[in-house]
């Protein structure tokens, strides 16, 4: 891993081991990031195995071309610079219509959070950006300075689950009427000013949920995850598996619901036999989410909210 792209991989062994890797299998890392999961997965593949890695951040791919060089030289890795919502189209274009496993590590990678100018963090002063793909058009600046009051309230409440969404949106509306809100620090201070004093005494930064909400809006994170996970489940071969790491309740709720719909069947009571075409195509590998160990939590504070869910395809 290059010094410029330092990232501690969360739930490394659990996520990959749960895929039950076949040495000659075709696998996908939908969120390359710091390439930790990819490196471990590749170590389990034989010469016939192949890994396709998606990331919309060119820096992540540049880093992986260094850290995964030995596997690249053997022709075992293909990088795809794109949003994982285009998973099926990009793989089909490469002649891949079936995969043996796929993993997702949702959310922002550590390097993106730590890179000040990306504007993801409320802890560092930076321009309001928050784009995972630097070539996309919508930025946090546009959301904060141009979205109508009602749209801001909706986004803050839906994606940030912040009960002071109206007060925060009103404070933003008042401030931007005087001059544009340009930096993360300006925004964080406005959020703090909109909240009651007793709220500011609670654990955690008062701007965390609102920054999350804006980031999700800028990158359409939930929409992309929904589309991509469904496409991944279609692409999986029989006995293929999907591992999804989430970091907040919205991502986890989405993943849980998709897996539930695919692993259960809604049939009338009293039906003696379930028709074959109505039987669920998936089963849950673990009924409850897999959480980081105590040792991982002690070593990596960013792992504290991580949850891993895994499903297996049992019917085509």
UniProtKB/Swiss-Prot annotation:
Specify the protein name: Ribosomal RNA small subunit methyltransferase H
Return the Gene3D superfamilies for the record. Answer: Putative methyltransferase TM0872, insert domain, Vaccinia Virus protein VP39
Where is this protein found? Cytoplasm
PANTHER family given in the database record: 12S RRNA N4-METHYLCYTIDINE METHYLTRANSFERASE (PTHR11265:SF0), S-ADENOSYL-METHYLTRANSFERASE MRAW (PTHR11265)
State the Pfam families in the record. Methyltransf_5 (PF01795)
* Residue positions binding S-adenosyl-L-methionine: 35-37, 55, 84, 105, 112
GO cellular component terms attached to this protein's record: cytoplasm
Molecular function GO terms recorded: rRNA (cytosine-N4-)-methyltransferase activity
- State the Gene Ontology BP annotations: rRNA base methylation
> Family, per the entry?
Belongs to the methyltransferase superfamily. RsmH family.
Protein purpose: Specifically methylates the N4 position of cytidine in position 1402 (C1402) of 16S rRNA.
Broad class of enzyme this protein falls into: transferase
Gene designation: rsmH
Domain of life here?
Bacteria
Query: What is catalysed by this protein?
Result: cytidine(1402) in 16S rRNA + S-adenosyl-L-methionine = N(4)-methylcytidine(1402) in 16S rRNA + S-adenosyl-L-homocysteine + H(+)
Q: What is its EC number?
A: 2.1.1.199
Q: Which UniProt keywords apply?
A: Cytoplasm, Methyltransferase, rRNA processing, S-adenosyl-L-methionine, Transferase
């Amino acid at each position: 891993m290059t010094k410029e792209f330092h990232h501690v991989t969360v739930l490394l062994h659990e996520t990959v081991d749960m895929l039950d890797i076949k040495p000659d299998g075709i696998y996908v890392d939908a969120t390359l990031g710091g390439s930790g999961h990819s490196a471990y997965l590749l170590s389990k593949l034989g010469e016939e195995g192949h890994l396709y890695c998606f990331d919309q951040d060119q820096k992540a791919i540049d880093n992986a071309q260094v850290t995964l060089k030995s596997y690249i030289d053997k022709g075992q890795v293909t990088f795809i610079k794109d949003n994982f919502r285009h998973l099926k189209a990009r793989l089909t274009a490469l002649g891949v219509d079936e995969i043996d496993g796929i993993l997702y590590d949702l959310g922002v990678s550590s390097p993106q959070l730590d890179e000040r100018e990306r504007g993801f963090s409320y802890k560092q002063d930076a321009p309001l950006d928050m784009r995972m793909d630097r070539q996309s058009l919508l930025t946090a600046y546009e959301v904060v300075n141009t979205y109508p009051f009602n749209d801001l309230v909706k986004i803050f409440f839906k994606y940030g689950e912040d009960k002071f969404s109206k007060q925060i949106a009103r404070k933003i509306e008042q401030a931007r009427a005087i001059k544009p809100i340009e930096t993360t620090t300006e925004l964080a201070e406005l959020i703090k000013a909109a909240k009651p004093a007793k709220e500011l005494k609670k654990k955690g930064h008062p701007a965390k949920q609102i920054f999350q909400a804006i980031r999700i809006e800028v990158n359409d994170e939930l929409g992309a995850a929904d589309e991509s996970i469904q496409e991944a489940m279609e692409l999986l071969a029989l006995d293929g598996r999907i591992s999804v790491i989430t970091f907040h309740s919205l991502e986890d709720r989405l993943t849980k619901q998709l897996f539930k719909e695919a692993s259960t069947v809604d049939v009338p009571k009293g039906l003696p036999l379930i028709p074959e075409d109505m039987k669920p195509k998936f089963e849950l590998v673990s009924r409850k989410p897999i959480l980081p160990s105590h040792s991982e939590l002690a070593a990596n504070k960013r792992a504290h909210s991580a949850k891993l869910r895994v499903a297996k395809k049992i019917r085509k």
